[in-house]
Amino acid sequence: MKFKLNRTEKFLIRYYKPMFFSYFIILVLASLFFGFMGWSTIGRIFNTILLIFMFYVIFVPMSKAKQIQQLNDVDFDILSMIDACNQMIDAYNPKDITHLSSFCLFRIIGLINLGDFDRAEQEIKFFWQHFNLKKIHPSDIAQTHSLMANIALEKDDIKLFEDEMRIVYEYGNKPAIVGTFKHSYNYNVKGMELLSEAYFANRNNCAQDYEHRVFEHMNTNPLTGKPLKKKPKPMYYLMACSKLFMFYKNTDNNQKATYYAQQLLSIGNEQLNDYRKAKEYLENADRSN
């Protein structure tokens, strides 16, 4: 999962140094001009307005943009990721639904990876109750139901799991989600993961279908069939490996369970709940042999 920067944020990150330098030159020239003309009071008012404008229009948005950029660089240090999300949620304007909902989703994913399912469930319910869901993108809402389904599966609540996955399936067929494929390779993977989980829940050749859809779309644009110019971060691969490991482990397919457990160990770390399960599984398999 990656947070998107809008055009203004990208522009500020790229050009904030020359912009600050330009504003400094304007301040100096304005001070000299108003001083030369004997309009010192007007000069002070002008410079004050310019400084306020620079602070609120450039400095504050640029700082937030750089924080988002840093958050995108977080890999698998889950505790640091959750801490960063907490800081961003505290710092953001409550009306900025787009960014706030993304930070909340990222925090929920972190909690699930840590194995803190009760708190993750509380976070999802908070998300549903306190956000105006009409203003949130359908793919993000579908993601919350997908995550709740994961929690239900961990707690062996099969009815809740199937109910949540039906909702995911309904969202997965909405044009609003399919349409995002045109804009971001991250949404390609995210959207296909949601659809794959729906098939996974409906048990239509579930594991094979899931493998094909997720891993093929890690490298291919589903609209054009061409390879992606940018590769998605390993988190998607890790999440997919986690689900497939648990599926094959529970269906006694030891060969594939071992393969995906090894994949988890190669890309995860001790913080991850599924990493610990995979490690325990491989250790038990070694003792059995």
What does each of the following model-derived ranges do?
Residues F53-L133:
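N-terminal topogenic membrane-targeting module
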Residues F103, T144, G179-E193, K233, ...:
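The tetratricopeptide repeat
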Residues R107, M148, K190-E193, E197, ...:
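Structural register within alpha-helical repeat arrays
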Residues I42-R44, Q70-Q87, I112-F126, D157-N173, ...:
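Helix-turn-helix repeat elements of alpha-solenoid scaffolds
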Residues N86-I97, Q129-I141, G172-S184, N219-P232:
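Flexible helix-coil transition and linker loops at the boundaries of alpha-helical arrays
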Residues N202-N289:
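Long, non-transmembrane cytosolic or organellar matrix-exposed soluble domains/tails
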Residues Q70, G110, I151, S196-F200, ...:
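Residue-level signature for tetratricopeptide repeat
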Residues F36-L51:
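Hydrophobic alpha-helical transmembrane segments
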